[in-house]
Swiss-Prot record:
Tissue: Expressed by the venom gland.
Disulphide bonds in the chain: 11-61, 15-37, 23-42, 27-44
Record Gene3D superfamilies: Knottin, scorpion toxin-like
Domain LCN-type CS-alpha/beta: 1-62
Gene Ontology biological-process entries: defense response
InterPro entries: LCN-type_CS_alpha_beta_dom, Scorpion_toxin-like, Scorpion_toxin-like_sf, Scorpion_toxinL, Scorpion_toxinL/defensin
Pfam families, per the entry: Toxin_3 (PF00537)
Organism whose genome encodes this protein: Tityus costatus (Brazilian scorpion)
Identification of the protein by name: Toxin Tco-gamma
Record family assignment: Belongs to the long (4 C-C) scorpion toxin superfamily. Sodium channel inhibitor family. Beta subfamily.
Keyword Secreted tagged: yes
Residues the record lists as Cysteine amide modifications: 61
The keyword Secreted belongs to this UniProt entry's keyword annotation: yes
Amino acid sequence: KEGYAMDHEGCKLSCFIRPSGYCGRECGYKKGSSGYCAWPACYCYGLPNWVKVWERATNRCGKK
């Protein structure tokens, strides 16, 4: 599957001020095949189905 990588708070993983290759590495840590900075957040490809990705309908970023 593909989608925006999330941090531990459910927010999109920001790549705004990250070095080149950051998103590819982060997506790899999540078992994805590749990823890139879709400014300003990391977008991943080839993720296993069990990995949670950001979705507008279930967005919990900044909410308690």
